[in-house]
Amino acid sequence: MKKLLLLLLCVLCFVSCEKDLPINLCVESEVFLDTTISNHNVLIVGIDGFRSDALTEDITPFMYNLSSRDDVYFTPFHKTEEDTYSGPNWSSLLTGVHYYKHNVVDNSFVGSRFSTYPPFQYYLESAYQQINTSSITNWNPINTYIYQQYLDYTSESTLNDSMVFQSARDLLIEGYPIDPDVLFLHFDELDAAGHSFGFSPEVSEYVSTLSKIDVFVESLFNIIEEKRNDLGEDWLFFIVSDHGGDGTGHGDAENPHINQTIFFSQHPDLSFKPNYITNQTDLSPTILDYMGVDSEEIDCKMDGISIIE
């Protein structure tokens, strides 16, 4: 009996020394699809290192004007994860769970739990017989570690922002090499400018990079508008970011220039929650809600909420 007690104590001691991870009490369940929903599409434009106070009429005229439209949800106070690395924040945006669940705590992605907390596209692929999910990124770890084999198409090598934009145009206009129903884009050069010169609306290199991205975003939005008007396609449009920045870094999680960023959601016929401040886990459930996909597993696992009313 004493030997048994000693063995149990040793086991408890070993377990207590391991890094604590949340216990997943959610079970896999059937994914349900609202069959009244058809022809819904989603474009997510991800801009790495977007400091909120750089969204001005002079620097980003298109996004500045978009933010005040009646059919847009916008906040400059969108909450990042407490861990302000890129890895944890893109992971939370794309899985709908906080970093202590998906266990991405830096940009190495070591110990990630995407098999338990997969990206939202996993549920779309489970619900729809035929859906084309795709991702084009400048920062390739998003495709390598988060998306892995979950999507139908991902860019295979690191691209610069101009190449991301051109590849997105090819997909959206030409349907080449795939005609996307749900498309995620990632622009990284703003973050690079911040690290090299400073994250600030007073830094010319940061400003010029953001102005260039604003032109890309306007062009992408116009393509979506044409698809809505000419082809009858029903697109939900997002602009999101992983973190802001201050000086040449974004490690101070207490700094509002770092732990707050922008979040846009636009649709001509939807209403969004007023006076609600989004966080990184709200993107995924909003998309699944719009696409008519639900399950007990999703409700159990995801920390965020849909901002669609």
Residue positions per predicted region:
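Sec-dependent N-terminal signal peptides
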Residues: L4-C13
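Bacterial Sec-dependent N-terminal signal peptides
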Residues: F14-V42
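Structural recognition of the beta-strand scaffold that forms the well-ordered cores
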Residues: V42-G46, D53, Y73-F77, S91-L94, ...
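Metal-dependent active-site segment of extracytoplasmic phospho-/sulfohydrolases and closely related
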Residues: L43-I44, F62, K212-D252
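Short, structured active-site-proximal loop/turn typified by the sulfatase FGly-forming signature C/S-X-P-X-R
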Residues: D53-N89, G96-V97
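Substrate-binding rim/cap in mid-to-C-terminal beta-strand-loop elements of soluble/periplasmic
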Residues: P88-G96, A253-S295, I308
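Catalytic-site neighborhoods of secreted/periplasmic enzymes
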Residues: Y100-M163
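Active-site His/acidic residue clusters
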Residues: P141-Y153, R169-V215
